[in-house]
């Protein structure tokens, strides 16, 4: 460690996920001295995004379950006084399970002899990436290993040109985050390591047309690794949602850039169709008859102020939204569009009131930035936690990645947490402690019942619904394919989102888990895509996009866990959960705001920063 950290802070935050990062920004903005640490080598925790080879290295790190104690210079037990006790923090992250990787893309020997030799050294079902120690971290502030930083430089990226930009408040900014370097990977299929450069900003852009794509090989994906920014959890943002409102209010929006989600799709009678969202879309639709257009507009108009017409749904409050739609004399395809593509809810678990509220929310978000209710961050959702970390650092927050915390120090008499002891044996005191739940020891979580999220990440060669433009960002909810299964949310990203290489698409699939991720999601993958080898052999419809690469994994969902479920927590220790499986990031924002108001009830949550022109300096002397 190059130099020691200060020994006293107001707030210590462990973990750099979205809720922790929002809290760090809010605390720092209100004048608190903040220390924000993470044992990982990258920002975001389970909200992070990775390059192609970086993701594979991350997978290897999980499978190897590294628990090294490098750099430990003192035994923490010796630093605990007689009047104190310690809560030892977990050293191994166990929130990701059942990782499986499949590579369907061909190996192009001419592209890279060296890459091919590396692949051939591995077995066809298991290959390992470049060793973790040869890869660095993707960290927002560039920093020395375990050294702390009070400055916050942001990754400098040079985006490709776009036709036109529409900003939430945005500005060009410098970047110090090298987005490409991560740690270790060992998975079920081909994995290698190679990298390239990226870029940064915060704006909503229109689509760009690009020339027809060529065949993509695995070697090309490795060479273009840094063109990929692959989210562990990928969520669109409601244009009128609480996260966008917070980004604008706090002026954190200037650190990021967005694009409109251009299409809402539906999976109906075995094919993918585009769903009309706005009034103009409805009446221009060729999929709906004139009678259906009138029926749809009448129902959507009712949903906008459904609270004023409670007599319309009073008798159906306890019914499912699906059953309620059947009473409105809507055709089956309209019911399907409303349930799965507008309300985006479950057929079985969504009540009438929840469905009406979801539909109203969808409609209220239309038109703010584009023709759909959603926008998506360039470079992936992993950018958002980094933006809030940057704001924290701007107001004096201290950041330190690769910095393990061994334990919380608790005063026996008061029951309050007094400080932490890090992996270097340094004791750091604070008034409040915010901890990501993955760091909590098993004893503390013994009564907790977690849910699971099933995730799949795919790289494909074309869109699931081809149009004149190949730069479409699409959201599709696939209804349950069999009784007892759940609906699956599909998000398809084009290369202009800066999340994948040119001529490819990055596809995210998400659902609540009932089995392993592969068991939950593979039926949907088979419905929408065809592995490249089968396409070459002509074994399936050539109209389907070719599947080049796939990753499946399960992620823990702790969003529904209440504080009372944790055992023996000191009163001044607050817990943040990981991502939930729902649409948007409203839960993370609400959690951060609730905890902030609990800790600092008299302070405003993330107020706008002062305008430099309004700052008055007192004359000296």
Swiss-Prot record:
Provide the GO biological process annotations: intracellular protein transport; protein geranylgeranylation; small GTPase-mediated signal transduction
Instruction: From the Swiss-Prot or TrEMBL record, state where the protein is found.
Output: Cytoplasm, Cytosol
Keyword Cytoplasm tagged = yes
What species is this protein from? Mus musculus
Subunit annotation: Monomer. Heterotrimer composed of RABGGTA, RABGGTB and CHML; within this trimer, RABGGTA and RABGGTB form the catalytic component B, while CHML (component A) mediates Rab protein binding. Interacts with RAB1A, RAB7A and RAB27A, but has much lower affinity for RAB1A, RAB7A and RAB27A than CHM. Interacts with the non-phosphorylated forms of RAB3A, RAB3B, RAB3C, RAB3D, RAB5B, RAB5C, RAB8A, RAB8B, RAB10, RAB12, RAB35, and RAB43.
InterPro entries in the cross-refs: FAD/NAD-bd_sf (IPR036188), GDP_dissociation_inhibitor (IPR018203), Rab_escort (IPR001738), RAE1_2_domI_C (IPR054420)
Please tell me where this protein is predominantly located.
cytoplasm
SUPFAM superfamilies from the xrefs?
A: FAD-linked reductases, C-terminal domain (SSF54373), FAD/NAD(P)-binding domain (SSF51905)
Mind telling me which GO cellular component terms the entry cites?
cytosol; Rab-protein geranylgeranyltransferase complex
Q: Which GO terms describe its molecular function?
A: GDP-dissociation inhibitor activity; GTPase activator activity; small GTPase binding
> Could you identify this protein by its name?
Rab proteins geranylgeranyltransferase component A 2
């Amino acid at each position: 460690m190059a130099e020691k950290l200060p020994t006293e802070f107001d707030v210590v935050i462990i973990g750099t996920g979205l809720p922790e990062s929002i809290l760090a920004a809010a605390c720092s903005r209100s004048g608190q001295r903040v220390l924000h640490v993470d044992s990982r080598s990258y920002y975001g925790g389970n909200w992070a995004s990775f390059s192609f080879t970086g993701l594979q290295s991350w997978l290897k790190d999980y499978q190897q379950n590294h628990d090294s104690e490098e750099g430990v210079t003192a035994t923490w037990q010796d630093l605990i006084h007689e009047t104190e006790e310690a809560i030892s923090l977990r050293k191994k992250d166990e929130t990701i399970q059942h990782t499986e990787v499949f590579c369907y893309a061909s190996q192009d020997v001419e592209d890279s002899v060296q890459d091919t030799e590396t692949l051939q050294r591995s077995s066809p079902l298991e290959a390992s990436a470049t060793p973790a120690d040869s890869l660095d971290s993707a960290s927002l502030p560039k920093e020395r290993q375990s050294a702390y930083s009070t400055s916050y430089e942001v990754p400098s990226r040079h985006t490709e040109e776009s036709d036109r930009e529409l900003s939430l408040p945005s500005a060009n900014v410098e970047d110090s985050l090298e987005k490409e370097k991560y740690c270790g990977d060992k998975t079920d299929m081909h994995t290698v390591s190679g990298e390239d450069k990226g870029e940064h900003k915060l704006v909503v852009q229109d689509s760009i047309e690009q020339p027809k794509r060529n065949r993509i090989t695995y070697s090309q994906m490795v060479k273009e690794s840094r063109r990929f920014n692959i989210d562990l959890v990928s969520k669109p943002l409601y244009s009128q949602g609480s996260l966008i409102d917070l980004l604008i209010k706090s002026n954190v929006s200037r650190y990021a850039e967005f694009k409109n989600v251009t299409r809402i799709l539906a999976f109906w009678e075995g094919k993918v169709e585009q769903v009309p969202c706005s009034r103009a879309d409805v009446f221009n639709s060729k999929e709906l008859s004139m009678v259906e257009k009138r029926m749809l507009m009448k129902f959507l108009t009712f949903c906008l102020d459904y609270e004023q017409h409670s007599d319309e749904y009073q008798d159906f409050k306890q019914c499912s939204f699906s059953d309620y739609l059947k009473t409105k004399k809507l055709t089956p395809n309209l019911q399907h569009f409303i349930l799965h593509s507008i309300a985006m809810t479950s057929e079985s678990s969504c009540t009438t009131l929840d469905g009406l509220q979801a539909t109203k929310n969808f409609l209220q978000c239309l038109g703010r930035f584009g023709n759909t209710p959603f926008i998506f961050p360039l470079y992936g959702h992993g950018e958002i936690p980094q933006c809030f970390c940057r704001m924290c650092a701007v107001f004096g927050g201290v950041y330190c990645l690769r910095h393990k915390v061994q334990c919380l120090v608790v005063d026996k008499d008061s029951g309050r947490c007094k400080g932490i002891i890090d992996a270097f044996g340094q004791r750091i005191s604070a008034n409040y402690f915010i901890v990501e739940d993955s760091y909590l020891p098993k004893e503390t979580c013994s009564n907790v019942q977690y849910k699971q999220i099933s995730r799949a990440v795919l790289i494909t060669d074309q869109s699931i619904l081809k149009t004149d433009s190949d730069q479409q960002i699409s959201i599709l909810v696939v209804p349950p394919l069999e009784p007892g299964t759940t609906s699956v949310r599909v998000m398809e990203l084009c290369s202009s989102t800066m999340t994948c290489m040119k001529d490819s698409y990055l596809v995210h699939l998400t659902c609540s888990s009932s089995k392993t991720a592969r068991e939950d999601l593979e039926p949907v993958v088979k419905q929408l895509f065809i592995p490249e080898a089968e396409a070459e052999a002509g074994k399936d419809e050539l109209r389907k996009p070719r599947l080049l690469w796939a990753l499946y994994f399960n992620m823990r969902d702790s969003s529904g866990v209440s504080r009372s479920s944790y055992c023996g927590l000191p009163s001044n220790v607050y817990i943040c959960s990981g991502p939930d499986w729902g649409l948007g990031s409203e839960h993370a924002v609400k959690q951060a705001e609730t905890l902030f108001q609990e800790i600092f009830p008299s302070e405003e949550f993330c107020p706008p920063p002062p305008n430099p022109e309004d700052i008055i300096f007192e004359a000296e002397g």
